[in-house]
Each structure stands twice: as C-alpha cells, then as structure tokens.
Amino acid sequence: MGRVIGIDLGTTNSVMAVIEGGEPVVIPNAEGERLTPSVVAITPTGERLVGRFAKRQAITNPENTIYSIKRFMGRRFDDPEVQRTIKLVPYQVRRAQNGGVEVKMGDRWYTPQEISAMILQKLKQDAEAYLGETVDKAVITVPAYFDDSQRNATKDAGRIAGLEVLRIINEPTASALAYGLDKKGEEKVAVYDLGGGTYDISILDISEGVFQVLATNGDTHLGGDDFDQRIIDWLCDEFKRETGIDLRQDRMALQRLKEAAEKAKIELSSVQQTEINLPFITADATGPKHLVKTLTRSKLEQLVADLVEKTIPPMEQALKDAGLSPRDVDEVVLVGGQTRMPLIQRKVQEFFGKEPHKGINPDEVVAIGAAIQAGVLAGEVKEVLLLDVTPLTLAIETLGGVATPIIPRNTTIPTRKSQIFTTASDNQTQVEIHVVQGERPMAADNKTLGRFILDGIPPAPRGVPKIEVTFDIDANGILTVSARDLATGREQKITITASTGLTEEEIQRMIREAEEHAEEDRRKREAIELRNQAEALLYQAEKTLNEFSDRIPSELKLELENKMQAVREIVERDPMNTARLRPAYDELARTLSQVGARMYEQAGATASTGPDGGGRTSGAPGEETVEGEYREV
C-alpha cells in the first residue's frame, strides 16, 4: 500500500507533508524548496513546466503561464467574480460547453481541474522521490467557504493526478489540527486564514484530541492576489500620470508589475519603504521608459485598507453563529502568507483583544494539518477526532421559489437530515427537486447545485402525496440528495455534481492524458540524464586524448575520435533521441575503456622493466633498503 500525504493546494503556493516517525514533516520538492508555486506553463518549444520553473519564465511567456487557477475551480463562467478575475490575468479564458471555465495554454484549452491536477501530479512525483515509495492517496485541503461544486472539482483534480482523495478538509480546520495536536485542556480557537486567493475564519473548540468546528465564514474571492492588484493599479496609474502610457495594455509589462508588486508587498512586512525599479518597462517615440517608484508601508496600508476591513464582518458572523464573543476566544491562529502583513496582525489583535499566536509557519501549517488527518486515516495518529461543519445552508426550492433549508450552515458533518414535502397541484405525478446552497431566502438568489425528477407518483389531490427528501453530507462536505414517495416507496437519488463539473468520461480521459504525460516526463528525464552522461563521457574522452595522445595506438585513437564524433553529433543535433544516443554512448564508453586498458598495460610494462633490467627496484647505491614498518591503528 502506498503512503498517504497531506496537500495544501493553494492559490499562490502548494505544500505537501507526511507523518514520519509519528510527527508531521513538510516534504521538499525536487528543487529542494518547501513551497511549490501553483503555476503551470507551456514553453514556446512545447515543454510543460510546473512550479518554480513555470513562475520564473512568466514574464517572457505571460499568455501561456497559468496561475491563480484555484479562483476558477468549480465556478461558472458567468460568475461576477470569474469575470473580474478574467480582466486581471494575461492568459485567455473562455466559457466551457457546460457553462464552466476553460483556460488556454499552448494550443489547447484546459479545465481548472486539469491545471490543478498538473500541480498535484508534480507534488505526487516529488513526494515519491523523497519518500522512495509510491504515493497514491492524499488528504487535500480547501477553503472552508468552498461550496459543493468547488469541493467536487478539487476531488476530480486529485483523481486526474492519480491520487485517491481520502478526505477533503477545510484549511482553517487543518491549521487547528497542526496548532492543537499537543495541547492539553480545553481551548476556544479562532483561525484567521488569509491566503493567496481565499479568506476563511473558523471558530473551534479543542479539547483532549477532539477538534470541533463551531462555526465558519469567509470569502472565496479575497486574498493576497487582491493586495498585489492594488499595488499594480497604483503603479499603472502613477506611470500613466507621468508618461501618458497605460501599462495595462501590455501583457508582458503587467507580468513584470505583478512580480514586482508581490516582492514589494513581502518586503514591506519587515521594512518601512521599498523601491520598485523596472528599467525598460516600455517605450514610445522618445525612447525607452523606466519605472522607478518608492512605496512606503503607510501608502500600502492606505491602498489595501478596505480589503482588510472586508475580513471583519465574516469574523463577527462566525462568532455570532458560534454563540461567542471575541473575549471568549483563548487563542487566535494566523494562517496564510498574507497574514504576515503588520496591518492585518494589528486589526486581528484589535478585534479579539489579544495578540495572535505566532508559533507556527503560516505557509506550512495547513499542509501539516492535512498530514495529521492523513495520519489519522492511515492509523498512524491516534486519539484525534475531527468534527467539521458545512459552511453554507443547503436547501430545496419550494412553492413560490422559496429556499427551504434542510441543513443549516455550521451543521457538524457527516450528517443526514430528512423533511417531508407534498405536491403543489392536483394529480401531479412528478416533482422536480431543485437543490441550492446559500443564505438567501429565495432559491433563485442562491447557487444551484443540481436538479432531478421524482416521477411515478400516483395521481391524488394536492397536499396528499408525501415525499421525503433526504440530504446526506459525507465527511468531505460532498452532498447526496434522495427523494422518496412514501406511498409507493419509489426513490430517486443523486450525488450532487456541479453543472460545471466533469463527467466520468471526461475524468477518465484526463486521467489517461495525465498518465501519458507522466510517461512522457519520465522519458524526457531519462533523455536529459543520458545527454548529461554523454557530455561527461565526451569531456573525459577529450581529456584522455589531450593528455595521452602520444601513448594511444594510432588505430585505437582513430576509433576513439570517430566514436566521439558520433556522440557529439547526436548531442548537438538530436539530444532527446535516446534510441540513437544510447548505442553511440555505449560504443564510446567501450572504446574509452579499451584505451584505458591499453594504457594500463603499457604502464605495467614500463614499471616492470627498471634500468638494470630486473624487476626489483632498489634504493640509492650503497644504501640498504629499509623494510617499511606498519602499525595497526
């Protein structure tokens, strides 16, 4: 059986962790780093890059570099937040056939699930290389405020990447697991999680290994990306005021601005001001233009003040739902890189009246919590019980378009609840069950999760038939709905899959493509390794020729030169063709080995024939040869 790892699949960065010797540890990626940028790209030569290498080339290849894909997961193209994000990214986005989102990379269109799967596939491969064994199962975290379709999309991404997703858990809950694993006694903990693209606030009760979520709230479209965008907008406005040039029209310039904005924001968490210096950002008839601006911490705080304020109402609502006041909270845990900003730390401290806990790494804590949950499921971690909640009310549409709640928000999961409904008109033989998620009183104002028909109801006056509707939420927060006519026992059941979700056929196709790409990646790695070995062998052969040319027999020297030329030609013209390079490499290695053997024979012959013709060497004339003394150490 393969290992189970915990994965924080983030908007900006992703992290993976595992239980080793009973303790959670972060797994470094192939580049030796603990954070993997959630970035995927196709280069002009058709090579696919994931992580740091994809992020590094984003400035020169903005249209084919996909980032912040989490903001599109499980969302409809018409969603106002999706439309807002489309205006800010340099890559192309279009409506998918099912009403969801597709992004263009290279000459192909991909779903957000496929892009996320590419990130997960890299994490899986790097974890396998680090652990030295197969990784085929994972616990993946999502924002607490992710709805049903976003959770399903995340699970699909895991399947495409070749991972069995044992559990989807909420990011703040995972953080609380990491924080409270060794804590004794009872504590009320608030987890304030502001990441690259999402914001969550969760209130938990932690007591002797039981982690119970009391309430959760948040905004799935508020995060560090929005803070970066405020800096980008300010730079564009300032540059336009000074030069008359609008940098928003230049995709390459925007990518440079994004990188500079993120860097400046990070620096201003530890210094009072920073210089943003972007030479040759653009050009006009008068020549090249340079952007040089000083950004102070106070100016940044002015630019983002309203974004920070947007995090306050969800905190108030979560506390209200939990039946607590700020002073009832014993500890506040900050999660997500954006919480390193001093303004956010001050605001949180003002709200709760206590300094936030700073003993955990906000970038890594979610993955560590996911690894703990993975350890619980694998039996490696004992005496830990996680009781999470559903973040949004689940309801069905009833007469007049009203959303009638079945499971209120912040209900502990897994859970199962039923309610009896009836027909709205005489002799009605079927009913449509319209399932929605959200807090609005009218069904049309909430998010549709799915619709299905229960038919075969015997004709009767309205109000007579009794139809039992049951909602069943599993531990992943994923919903199954069933409707049963109590008179006939006739039942209809669906697991809710979003209208923007993937069909089973699409998922299987994507799994095959991902496996094929993994095989292609393996062949590419082998080809690169062989090329490196060939270049090293060429260097060794050239060195041997240069140093010992006069001692190598002419026919062997000619053979060596020919074999070197054959390898050099393939390395220079067709280095990825292992079918040609492997035999040429083997031939060169064999010939070089023959050269070495011939030279060794010559050296042996020379050593055995001293100036006196004997095989024994002697000291200087008249001196006795002294036996060497050996002492055991």
Curated annotation (Swiss-Prot):
Superkingdom classification of source: Bacteria
Chain residue ranges for the region called Disordered: 601-633
Gene Ontology terms, MF aspect: ATP binding; ATP-dependent protein folding chaperone; unfolded protein binding
Residue numbers carrying Phosphothreonine: 198
SUPFAM superfamilies per record: Actin-like ATPase domain, Heat shock protein 70kD (HSP70), C-terminal subdomain, Heat shock protein 70kD (HSP70), peptide-binding domain
Record flagged with keyword Chaperone: yes
UniProt KW keywords: ATP-binding, Chaperone, Nucleotide-binding, Phosphoprotein, Stress response
Pfam families for this protein: HSP70
Coiled coil: none
Induction (free text): By stress conditions e.g. heat shock.
InterPro entries, sorted: ATPase_NBD (IPR043129), Chaperone_DnaK (IPR012725), Heat_shock_70_CS (IPR018181), HSP70_C_sf (IPR029048), HSP70_peptide-bd_sf (IPR029047), Hsp_70_fam (IPR013126)
Free-text function comment from the UniProt entry: Acts as a chaperone.
Similarity section: Belongs to the heat shock protein 70 family.
The protein, known as: Chaperone protein DnaK
